[in-house]
Amino acid sequence: MKKSVALIIKKEIMPIAMNTITETINTPVTDECEVLVAGGGFAGISAAISASRQGADVTLVEREYILGGLGTAGIVTIYLPLCDGMGKQVSFGIAEELFRLSIKYGAEDKYPTAWLEPGNEELRKKQRFEVQYNPHMFALLAEKLLIENGVKILYGTCVCSVAMDGKKISSVIVENKSGRTAIAVKKSVVDCTGDADIAKLSGAATKEYAPKNILAAWHYSVSVSRGLSLHMVGACDSAVEKEEDVLTNRRFTGLDGTELSEMTQMAHSFILNDIMNNRKRDISHVPVTIPTIPQIRMTRRIDGVYTIDDTQMHKQFSDSVGLFSDWRKRGPVYELPFSTLYGNDVKNLICAGRCISVTDAMWDITRVIPVCAVSGEAAGTAAAMTDDFASLPIEDLQTVLTKNGVILHE
């Protein structure tokens, strides 16, 4: 299909003089799909695979040239637990499939022997079902998996606008090396951007993370004395930070271009300093990989039909679409309500990953890889089934998820 539609788009650019430029742009619609997934992190990978396995024609749009998001390009390479810390696995389906894929050819650290080898049930109470994986191997294997499942991947592509037909997204406007084009959406859109970018562009209600983000500068190095090692410079999150981990008192929203550029430069400075300090002790020490995206954790999320809080562990929800644990402690298990994945404003938009509808206190629990994968599978499956998420019979969705190995309730 190749057709053209004239879209009148106004852009305001505010330099020092506060001038504005009004542009009238004719944007060609060059492609179409049933389900468009925006963002190729763990949530986007899960959503695209699940939608395609349900028979949908799926296009995944990713701004970088590598899949995995923070879990690869961001060097946050710890697949946090699929278990409750008490010896019981709670997250299944694609969450477990991607876990096993990440270490198909070996783990870097924390290999969960008790979970991957038989006869270790007692040891599972002492060892969590988590692992440190190689980011490059995972990115390559994930790409292969998506292609095998018939997903079309557009790398180097940013979503810059949407076209609406009433309360539904009819086309997604993208920019890449081909210029500015539109992709017609025949059914639904899954926002896996991590920042609720599609929700924001489409006019859906969103909320920002009030505490903002701290600076991290994780990177990989190799040396004769230590071999390959992950340097977790700076605190990874506010929940477990120690005073000595805090690199700067400045906090970052993750939603401002200038701020993100400054944050990246600060992170690079700390990485370089860490490298040079290590080289003083071992001249063979050299960097292997540094993050190519900002190591931002929590920014903006949708204001969904329902918002879940961290106090609701072990609570049963009639619209549960999966289970996940609190990676920070042993015991708590949560059901994921389907109503946290979509809002009231845009009928055919659903979210997965760290931009689902949760309180600030809950955000640190739900932003991690297992929850991204669980929510991604639910969102992608639903996206293949409907163009109006509020009207989708939850029993129909739950039947498909259960058939695919997802556990809905404790």
What is each residue range found by the language model?
Residues 2-35:
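Extreme N-terminal leader/targeting segments of oxidoreductases
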Residues 15-17, 24, 56-57, 63-161, ...:
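Conserved N-terminal/central alpha/beta ligand/cofactor-binding core
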Residues 35-56:
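N-terminal Rossmann-like FAD-binding beta1-loop-alpha1 element of flavoenzymes
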Residues 38-40, 61-64, 192-194, 354-355:
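Active-site-proximal beta-strand/loop segments in catalytic clefts of secreted hydrolases
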Residues 29, 33, 43-44, 182:
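Ligand-binding pocket scaffold of soluble enzyme catalytic domains
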Residues 29, 54, 64, 342-344:
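Extracellular/periplasmic catalytic domains that process cell-envelope and extracellular macromolecules
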Residues 26, 70-72, 94, 98, ...:
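Flavin (FAD/FMN)-binding glycine-rich loop and adjacent Rossmann-like elements that form
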